[in-house]
Amino acid sequence: MTITKEKIAFMLNAELGFSKSLCEEVVNAVFTNILDIAKEQKLILKNFGSFEVKHKNSRPGINFHTKSQITIEPKNILRFVPSAKLKALINEND
């Protein structure tokens, strides 16, 4: 299931009764702040998980279509590690 910021704002509106525009502003502000923090340092959301930007150096790779060797460019990746509580919550119905 894909959930959008608009859907989260709609759920806040339905749950709390605040105006749609206020809910959209709050959701946008929360995501903007989370992204700003995650770019600079490890971000831990208690009982949810942690986000961290990791740098991957360039490395050799293979183009599967041509079978030729290529160099994969360095890049930053976002790593998410779920908390133990979130893992337990997801797996409690199994």
Swiss-Prot record:
SUPFAM superfamilies: IHF-like DNA-binding proteins. GO terms for cellular component: cytosol. Pfam families: Bac_DNA_binding. Gene3D superfamilies: IHF-like DNA-binding proteins. The keyword DNA-binding applies. Keywords: DNA-binding. InterPro entries: Hist_DNA-bd, IHF-like_DNA-bd_dom_sf. It comes from the Bacteria. GO terms for molecular function: DNA binding; structural constituent of chromatin. Belongs to the bacterial histone-like protein family. This is Histone-like DNA-binding protein. It comes from Rickettsia bellii (strain RML369-C).
